[in-house]
Swiss-Prot record:
One of its GO terms (cellular component) is plasma membrane. The chain crosses the membrane at residues 86-106, 114-134, 253-273, 307-327, 348-368, 377-397, 410-430. This is XK-related protein 6. The gene is xkr6. The keyword Cell inner membrane does not apply. It comes from the Eukaryota. The keyword Transmembrane helix applies. GO terms for biological process: apoptotic process involved in development; engulfment of apoptotic cell; phosphatidylserine exposure on apoptotic cell surface. The lineage of its organism: Eukaryota, Metazoa, Chordata, Craniata, Vertebrata. Its main location: membrane.
Length: 578
């Protein structure tokens, strides 16, 4: 959502700048000489290892010979309002989903359909109460012992009057948060506060870093809460309303609106959460809003197809529907466990997390592993397609023709057309709009897109043997378009001297300059998390207590050092709850 630091204690704004998209020069005067520094989409880094065979080098030379047209990019102000609009739309989707469900429950009650009214209300209130309890617990962790409350005791310069005033303010905050969560508005408040902190991080020059920290943590919290509530409330609600419409052989407009709101909420939360994953990672390129919109339609169509097939099957086979869901959940959970995830601190927590992911896999694809996902995603969608075919075929064979002939053909077409449309949107996203560049590329030169003008191109050179490194070290392995490192002798001897190494052994900023830690840094005796995990969210929350202390007692930037490497990441670039 917001900007990263530039390595010198300056936050550029509410928009994403941590991948150097917004610091690109015009290139009007330097296009003929090309550039020797660019953002490489094939090796996940902002510096490439350029040899004679490098596609990046050929692309830059072609770019410098007359293709140096600067692509239009939104200004920081435009990005700010796009971010605000994204949050406002998330709030509207939230209110629409909850409001239509409550309205429908009241409508069932007036029609004396007490069973449907009770189930509809149950799937609204119970998930909301659980999420509000978790949200309030996080507030207590952040605001009590070890959190913000412990910071006051570290400063002896505060006067007694100031401490008394702070106590009154803290009491007001406690009362306000309690009332907010009692009325089930904790997520709404977090969305509003995220937008406020993002705007302040863009406008407040003196306190940008503190506003950015608070905004980043708040946005991560509200996305995690919305993801949890959506799969506890919207997914069961959608299946329930479709089953009611199919069993009663009629669809009222309020039922359709409620089902559409639940469907949109599922798709929106998944797209928003996926965008958050990339925006919060310093080693990932942020997702554009065009990519997020296509991702939204991908989820919208695939979930529609899945839920419609489940509802059709459940309208005829009540008991077998429950058996099918349990079997599918067990198979998906076993598949995830067999894949060897490494999210949680203990084995049993890991198994529990994988079981929760298995529930998500009943409705849609959800990536839980770092690395290539192509084959796993294809396998999942092949299984889902086969299941949808079997479920709809059984429904069509055992349905009551007298009551279903009016919509049977439309239902079958809807299942398979929605699935095909969702797969088409997925291919469009990965083929054209993926943040790391087109995944379905034919030309190798399409892996690189963004240029930083002003530096000379490496000269044309003949293949030569690499110069031995210090102390006779081996040649630095190159990283190809597939993301794998090549260490063969042929690669080492048939390349030019490297201009940049793929992975620097020293902490460097965006321009390749060594970063000298200005202030204290936190040592974490664990590997850096490579993909989001529920347990990592709580690890991050425990770190916040130290963060809240350091930002008050130290005027300099704090850093985080992980066990698995010497790279020093600024505190602002730490992936919150991921």
């Amino acid at each position: 959502m917001a900007a990263k630091s530039d390595g010198r204690g300056v936050v550029t704004g509410f928009a994403q700048l941590h991948n150097l998209d917004e610091v690109v020069g015009t290139g009007e005067d330097d296009a003929r000489n090309g550039s020797s520094f660019h953002i490489c989409h094939c090796c996940n880094t902002s510096s490439c290892y350029w040899g004679c065979r490098s596609a990046c080098l050929h692309y830059l030379r072609a770019k410098g010979k007359g293709e140096g047209k600067e692509t239009a990019r939104p200004t920081p102000e435009e990005r700010l309002w796009l971010d605000c609009l994204w949050i406002v739309l998330a709030l509207l989707v939230f209110f629409w989903d909850v409001g239509t469900d409550l309205w429908l429950a009241v409508d069932y009650y007036h029609k004396q359909d007490f069973l449907w009214s009770g189930l509809t209300l149950f799937f609204v209130l119970v998930p909301s109460v659980l999420v509000q309890i978790l949200s309030f617990r996080w507030f207590v962790q952040d605001y009590t012992g070890g959190g913000l409350g412990s910071v006051e005791g570290l400063s002896s310069r505060r006067a007694a009057a100031s401490l008394q005033r702070d106590k009154c303010c803290r009491l007001s905050v406690w009362i306000w948060q309690t009332v907010i969560h009692i009325f089930q508005l904790g997520q709404v408040w977090r969305y509003i506060r995220t937008m406020y902190l993002g705007i302040q991080s863009h406008r407040q020059k003196e306190n940008q870093r503190r506003f950015y920290w608070a905004m980043m943590y708040e946005y991560a919290d509200v996305n995690m809460l919305r993801l949890l509530e959506t799969f506890l409330e919207s997914a069961p609600q959608l299946v329930l309303q479709l089953c009611i419409m199919i069993q009663s052989n009629k669809a009222e407009w309020l039922q359709c609106v409620s089902a559409l709101s639940s469907l949109l909420s599922l798709a929106w939360v998944l797209a928003s959460y996926h965008k958050l994953l990339r925006d919060s990672r310093d080693d990932k390129k942020s997702m554009s809003y065009r990519g997020a919109l296509v991702h939204l339609f991908w989820r919208l169509f695939t979930i529609s197809s899945r839920v419609l097939s489940l509802a059709l099957f459940a309208s005829v086979f009540h008991i077998y529907f429950g058996i099918f869901v349990v079997l599918h959940w067990c198979a998906m959970a076993f598949w995830v466990i067999h894949g060897g995830t490494d999210f949680c601190m203990s084995k049993w927590e890991e198994v529990l997390f994988n079981m929760v992911v298995g529930v998500v896999y009943v409705f849609c694809w959800f990536n839980v592993r770092e690395g290539r996902t192509r084959y796993r995603m294809v396998a999942y969608y092949v299984v889902v397609l086969l299941e949808n075919v079997i479920l709809t075929s059984l429904w069509y064979a055992y349905r009551d023709p007298a009551t279903t002939d009016a919509y049977a053909s439309l239902a079958l077409c809807g299942v398979f057309l929605c699935f095909a449309s969702g797969v088409a949107c997925m291919v469009l996203y990965y083929g054209v709009l993926h943040p790391m560049g087109p995944r379905l590329r034919v030309l190798a030169s399409s892996c690189c897109a963004e240029l930083l003008w002003g530096l000379p191109l490496p000269p044309e050179a003949e293949p030569m043997a690499p110069t031995p490194g210090p102390r006779g070290s081996q040649a630095t392995p190159t990283r190809g378009l597939t993301g794998e490192y090549a260490e063969s002798d042929e690669t080492a001897t048939d390349t030019c001297l490297p201009v940049f190494q793929v992975r620097s052994t020293e902490p460097v900023d965006a321009a390749g300059r060594p970063i000298q830690p200005e202030g204290p840094f936190i040592k974490i005796d664990m590997p850096r998390k490579r993909y989001p995990a529920w347990d990592a969210h709580f690890v991050d929350r425990r770190l916040r207590r130290t963060v809240n202390v350091l930002q008050y007692i130290s005027p300099n930037a704090a850093g985080i050092r992980y066990r698995d490497g010497p790279l020093l990441y600024e505190l602002l670039q730490y992936e919150s709850s991921l």
